[in-house]
Amino acid sequence: MSKGSGGITARIIDFTLGLRLADLPPAVLNEARHGLVDTLGVALAGVAEEPASLLRDVQLQAGAAGPCTVLGDARTAAPMTAAQLNAYAAHVLDFDDTQLSTTPDRIFGLLTHPTVPPLAAALAVGERQKATGAQVLEAFLVGFEVECKISEAIHSHHYKKGFHSSGTVGTFGAMAATARLLGLDATQIGHALAIAASMASGIRVNFGTMTKPLHVGRAAQNGVTAAELAARGFTGGGDALDGPWGFFQVFSFADGFDPDRIVGVLGNPHTIVSPGVSIKPYPCGVLGHPSMDAMRTLVLTHDVKPEQIKAIRLRAGSNILNPLRYKVAKSELEAKFSPPFMLSAVAIRRKAGIHEFTDEFVLSEPVQAMMAKVTTVLDPEIEARGFEKIRSTVEVDLLDGRTLVQPADERYRDRKSTRLN
């Protein structure tokens, strides 16, 4: 529980106004450029997905025209609509980066998908404003840092009890990026924060459905809308983040926040550099990635063929097994949160990319048969070690009587230490 905020809302406002690209170290700019390229690539792949097409059809109906590019479509849109559609496309594959936490009390040691909301907002608004590339990059970095530090500060119950922080906190990242490009003053940013706080949304029951990426799309859209409204004189309450009825108190179920994760650390260091982000080798829930790596190691090291496998066991803690909740995946979207599918895909094809995460492959007879061989086990020893890392062990029983065992690597993928191959 926070005992005092020290004017957190005001500090966010000051940071949003004060960051200058010329003052940033080269490492921050380098990581930002990598993030932009990675996320745009993921978004371009995502536009071909059916849910992204459905959303475009609804949002680009007559009367929704505007000057901003919509990826994968010849039509253009207003900034808030373009931001939503492009952010949805960037998250629909579940292939975008993930924020690493600085402290061990955060479940998984992970927080938001930080790049998509501020980037989608900055690109759409920047296009309408005819901003320079440097101005768009500056706005993106403002939004990225605001989003990440708010995510660090709010009590972990925000996520544990059901909110999807990429949707809720991502709204503030998109708002801050937009506010910077619109040139809002301190009073207007305060109103925009309050508007954004009332628009923040996203609940985890929708993981494994078309609605999960809508959380991120709406974060981008709502952030743009909040700043656009404030620019036109629309008002909101004061102390929107740290007031007694503010975002931190309400969205943490009254458990508050840690002001020390914002006070004095906004841009010091920049989260994009330290602790950085985890990049994904597979287009699915990051909680399953270490187990998939372990399965791939077993299959390749021992040259295991699918027909040799009698049974597969995944031993893990509840921080993996509860969120990855689909025991038998019946669609591509469910497969993204299904350990039996994740391990089955690797067992059958020795990889798991966008060509494996399709309804056709998920529903194929070999995959459904392999999933039936997979069981998940809540391991008390792993559970006792805590939740700050994604820990698991994969065991494969072969028909010849051997059992192969591979503990998963606890380290997260990043751009510096792990090649994606």
Q: What do the predicted segments below correspond to?
A:
Residues 28, 32-35, 117, 135, ...:
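Residue-level detector of well-ordered alpha-helical segments, enriched
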Residues 46, 122-129, 175-182, 227-229, ...:
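Well-ordered alpha-helical scaffold segments within catalytic/enzyme domains
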Residues 91-152:
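Hydrophobic alpha-helical hairpins/lids featuring a short glycine-rich hinge
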Residues 116-124, 145, 169, 173-177, ...:
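Short amphipathic alpha-helical face segments that pack within enzyme cores
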